[in-house]
């Protein structure tokens, strides 16, 4: 029975996703912490999209 707990813990750690592997920014707090802005529809001129701000159509934009 103890072996099952050990097995489950190893599987959990092994299958846990790594940060940064599945894309960039996905919420407004992370966007603002990275020094970017949330902007609807498209990024302004001279800004580059680095993620989304959680809502559909809202982009996280940062100056390159």
UniProtKB/Swiss-Prot annotation:
Transmembrane segments: none annotated. Residues 1-23 form the signal peptide. InterPro entries: Beta/alpha-defensin_C (IPR006080), Defensin_beta-like (IPR001855). Changing residue 46 to A: No impact on fungal cell permeabilization. Impaired antifungal activity. Disulfide bonds join 31-60, 38-53, 43-61. Residues 33-48 are annotated as: Phosphatidylinositol 4,5-bisphosphate (PIP2) binding. SMART domains: DEFSN. Expressed in lung epithelial cells (at protein level). Expressed in foreskin, lung and trachea. Lower expression in kidney, uterus and salivary gland tissue. Expressed in epithelial cells of the respiratory tract, with higher expression in distal parenchyma of the lung, trachea, and tonsils, and lower expression in pharynx and adenoid, and low expression in tongue and larynx. It is found in: Secreted. Monomer. Homodimer. This is Defensin beta 4A. It comes from Homo sapiens (Human). The gene is DEFB4A.
